[in-house]
């Protein structure tokens, strides 16, 4: 009953959000309804003849200079029962004429020739492009925001023009043009604002504060914001930062999981400079593969997706790396408990070519090696252990500017993890026959990615980007065993060895292109296309075995292998960000994609639309619809994203995943630097995959397609966000109320069941406060309703009799003596306890000579040491379900209720790191 009531309440809110602006829309359209209706069917006539007929039907008079209509060609014009305003707009759109209706008078004037001002907005200190900077004309308040490469284009009437450029965290500046009558290139350099006092956020920056643009479910994070978030082991992490935003579930305690608006782990598209990343985890998910020292900023989309993005259902994380300083050399070095970080940037050719390199490496293996060596040395029991884990990241960016119009860049990312472990038993001095018995295992995984891109300003209104991309992910699990007994050459000598290897990989190669065309200040048109060649090796297993001496043999073979799968993916897209009216802005786009695999071609048409209705200067209503398609899936053994999980494409049997999402919400700005939003959403998903009951992704069993069930899902909810982006105190408060469920015909008898991360409530509070120029305090508190999992809540004894446990008198536990069979009644039938945690961080800045800086970071993860459950396991003891006391005459029904134990692994964890900037 409670769930039904909450569903109705949520839908009522959602409907209210959608229909709230209707009165305003009706009021706006009232003028159109009052307009006279015009019907014309005229062929090869002069424009004055058309105007005379309109005057007759509408009862209006046209006022214009006689020279305005001279030497205009004859036209054919046809409308049927159309409002006067719309009729005139269509009539004059192909003429250099503008009109204005004033009562019964229609004034015609010559359209002024337009001039275009275009260029780049850059950081004055480094010449790096500033993404999302605001450039606007003061008098008309017409403006533009820079694209992902810092480019802007403004088309304005000629004359006296005053431009204003601004970007949060930088000093704004203005430019005056007197009687400007030609297209002009203007490259703007903004100076970083080092002052502590509040940065003024102008009305033109409303785009960045989400009131004026059409974007929904979108957040932008700078490197500074990411670093200001309290960290685990002193390691800043973009995924951990995203986990603190509304609508995002983190999954398992401490790991870099991302489950967005009821989606799955594989529904997130991670991009580094436009190139997809398939495995984002280090240390099993404690850290992500994104080195914060290499990041310039990132855009996070979870609704209202622009048409240029595709390939995943749930979200897009678009990461832009640093371009490199073209003026001076700068760098930083960080020492933490888990890893070290070194970055360097600077000019190769001043103001022409720059580089940026960032290297991160863990030293868990370095720190643990002496301890393991000492332990092995002091042990006298004939046993040695070996354990090693290490990871590294390398980010490299080369950036060359041929001219103000042309630029080329190369971006490289390489990240690898290595985990090795094992042990060896060997004979001691007391034993007569020497022997060794060793077992060793290793797990390796990593990404290698490269992007070669070229950007070019074709003219003042057209900007283009073309890039070639390469991306490879692979993992390998290897296990070996070696046994030697006796002395080689003697009769009793024998030796055997075996090795098994399992690997998975995915490789992409392709071309991406995108273009920004700005015909006027009312339109920004983006279009382009992608082509990718995929190569999948979902599973390759090999075994080797050999023996000598008394055990002579040799064998090499495959045990279960999926063949290589090749697939081709292509897409074209187009979108128009259009200021329809001063208060109405529309972003309409479409994406068409094709995926060819196993001689089967799938096509998807993905329409996208977002609108913004400006109710006041500081308040807007938005609504959006987006269809997303996904052609690849991630298959694994658990809910933790393991390196051994395999990416698989759609097949002849399994169709592409599709989601349709509608969103609506209000956005409000207060006192320049505060922004508030409330969004409601409803998302339908189909062709989802999950394992059938009793199956998992294990080698040597049925083909993977046969293990999968195909079903549907839905998620809906409301998200609230309050954010402050400037001043001494910054941060956000976010709350999410959401539902998410699934339905598969072959799972749970076709009944709906809650999704794994169906977290009803989520609350996040993130605060950063500058106590002074040298001290910054950060805090983050999160609360989430418990995750769900499938457990056997009852067990059945097949044979034997129930006996009272010796522990019964203390614990009221029963212990079955026969074979016990687990009973699974529903999928995801158990909800874990709520999750909550407080993290604190302290940054101490120590200025040095010549602009150098030392930064101490002290972090405390899980301040009050809440042992949030990481896993649940079943106890060996059982509780009887019929609640009979010993000695009761009632027969035992054969069912028992198990006792469960919750395991938490992340207590309070203090950490410290030191960064030296030069």
Q: How would you name each of these model-derived features?
A:
Residues 504, 508-510, 560-565, 571, ...:
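Outer membrane beta-barrel strand-and-loop segments of large Gram-negative receptors
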Residues 682-684, 702, 706-793:
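Gram-negative outer-membrane beta-barrel transporters
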Residues 338-361, 377-422, 442-464, 470, ...:
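Transmembrane beta-barrel wall of Gram-negative outer-membrane proteins
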Residues 140-151:
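Short, acidic Ser/Thr/Gly-rich low-complexity loop/linker segments typical of extracellular
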Residues 474, 542, 617-662, 682-705, ...:
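Surface-exposed extracellular loop regions of Gram-negative outer-membrane beta-barrel proteins
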Residues 142, 171, 200-306, 316, ...:
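Periplasmic N-terminal accessory/gating domains of Gram-negative outer-membrane beta-barrel systems
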